[in-house]
């Protein structure tokens, strides 16, 4: 089936909706508020990682078929554990509950300030929020109709209203904070790395492929090609929205310096330009952005676990994850974050390595590349995480701290490159022997 421009636009909007959650909303304005006059070089670095990694991730997982098949190139045991940890950590263990708690904070700030019954309101909000998200997620092959046609255009319109208000109240950018004064591109690159959206790309890849099939595509090559085009299109849209949010942050940071986070940066400008209506506008932006991401995560996680345990129906998995997320978002989010964030920090380097390997020759050509690079990066990532937790001997910790980019959280990079070279070299030697 030949896709029309309308179909492609719907898929681009759908992919954008899946990625653009609360974190994506607050990172760029906070970066700009900090970077001040160096906002644009910092945003160039930010977009390289915050846009580039997710696009490459979508293309990588659709090339492989799904995350399980991609991980199986390392080892069957690796494929049994790695995707499970990814889905649990980024799903009910972190991102799904946080969509409700983060958006509720903005709703409470706009409409419930001073209320003595915030816990009760939060419970009611989370029940409604996850009920709506769960109902939308019940048909994963129809996300283009719900996200692409309705929720994403609504989100873009709301962000556009905030951006126009910023243009009507211009203010010069402030001075750059110390971290952005000398190497703003590198600092922006590191900030984009911290979004960890590449993990979401591996999770969303299968849902994107499912929606392409629902639009009439059946051949694997056609699905890979269209997923790549949709990923690039969504990446361009992400970049444009990030730049708009960065301008908002630059203006807000110049007018009201000292904000502690991106939500505060946005709140100061929205309240100044639109008053109470501005806070309602900002709350609506957060709710729609978080709802979009929640739908995508519920659908992706339920699809994965239904494939692994088909005796439990897909709707049952959606309901289970929604109910778990209601509980965590109300009573245990900080505790679950304490567990999930280290797990994500452990897995993120491996995610980036798998994405890179997906574009290199297949395992038949370099049979030792995936196992050595995958297991080696896992070992390096675990050692670095243990060092930061203070559980390694002092001598070993001191040795790890001399690795390049250790302080920036990229200490795994040099060991990873060594393991990649080792895997490729040993594979070539094995072929010659």
Task: Outline where the language-model segments fall.
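Hydrophobic, membrane-embedded alpha-helices of multi-pass small-molecule transporters
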Residues: 10-20, 165-172, 181-245, 278-290, ...
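Helix-loop-helix connectors at the membrane interface of multi-pass transporters/channels
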Residues: 31, 101-121, 213-214, 294-320
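Selective recognition of specific alpha-helical transmembrane segments in multi-pass small-molecule
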Residues: 52, 56, 154-166, 200, ...
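Membrane-water interface regions at transmembrane-helix termini and the short interhelical loops
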Residues: 62-70, 129-151, 214-217, 326-339, ...
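TM-loop-TM module centered on a large, flexible mid-protein loop between adjacent transmembrane helices
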Residues: 68-72, 241-291, 298, 307, ...
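Hydrophobic alpha-helical segments and their helix-loop junctions in multi-pass secondary transporters
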Residues: 92, 96, 156-181, 198-199, ...
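Membrane-interface loop-to-helix entry segments
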Residues: 136-166, 340-352, 372-378
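C-terminal membrane-solvent junction of multi-pass transporters and transport-like membrane proteins
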Residues: 352-421, 432-433
């Amino acid at each position: 089936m030949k896709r029309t421009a309308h179909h492609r636009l719907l898929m681009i909007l759908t992919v954008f909706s899946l990625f653009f959650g609360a974190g994506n909303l607050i990172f760029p304005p906070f970066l700009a508020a900090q970077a001040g006059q160096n906002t644009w070089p910092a945003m160039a670095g930010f977009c390289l990682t915050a846009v580039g990694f997710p696009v490459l991730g979508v293309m990588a997982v659709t090339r492989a078929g799904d995350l399980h098949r991609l991980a199986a190139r390392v080892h069957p045991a690796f494929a049994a554990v790695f995707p499970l940890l990814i889905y649990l950590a980024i799903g009910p263990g972190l991102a799904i509950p946080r969509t409700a708690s983060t958006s509720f904070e903005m709703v409470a700030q706009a409409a419930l300030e001073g209320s003595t019954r915030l816990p009760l309101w939060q419970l009611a909000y989370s029940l409604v929020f996850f009920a709506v998200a769960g109902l939308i997620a019940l048909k994963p092959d129809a996300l283009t109709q719900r996200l692409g046609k309705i929720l994403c255009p609504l989100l873009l319109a709301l962000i556009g209203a905030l951006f126009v208000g910023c243009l009507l109240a211009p203010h010069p950018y402030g001075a750059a904070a110390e971290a952005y004064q000398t190497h703003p591109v590198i600092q922006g690159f590191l900030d984009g790395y911290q979004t960890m959206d590449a993990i979401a790309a591996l999770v969303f890849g299968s849902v994107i492929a499912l929606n392409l099939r629902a639009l009439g595509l059946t051949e694997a090559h056609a699905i890979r090609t269209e997923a790549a085009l949709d990923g690039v299109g969504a990446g361009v849209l992400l970049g444009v929205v990030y730049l708009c949010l960065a301008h908002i942050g630059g203006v807000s940071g110049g007018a009201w310096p000292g904000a502690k986070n991106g939500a505060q940066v946005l709140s100061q400008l929205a309240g100044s330009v639109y008053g109470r209506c501005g806070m309602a506008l900002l709350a609506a932006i957060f709710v729609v952005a978080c709802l979009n991401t929640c739908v995508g995560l519920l659908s992706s996680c339920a699809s994965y676990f239904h494939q692994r345990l088909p005796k439990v129906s897909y709707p049952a998995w959606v309901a289970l994850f929604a109910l778990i997320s209601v509980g965590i978002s109300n009573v245990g989010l900080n505790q679950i974050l304490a567990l999930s964030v280290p797990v994500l920090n452990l897995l993120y380097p491996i995610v980036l390595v798998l994405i890179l390997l997906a574009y290199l020759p297949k395992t038949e050509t370099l049979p030792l590349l995936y196992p050595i690079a995958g297991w080696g990066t896992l070992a390096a990532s675990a050692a670095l995480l243990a060092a930061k937790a203070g559980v390694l001997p002092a001598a070993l910790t001191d040795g790890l701290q001399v690795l390049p980019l250790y302080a920036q959280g990229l200490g795994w990079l040099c060991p990873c490159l060594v393991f990649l070279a080792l895997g490729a070299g040993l594979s070539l030697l094995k072929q010659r022997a």
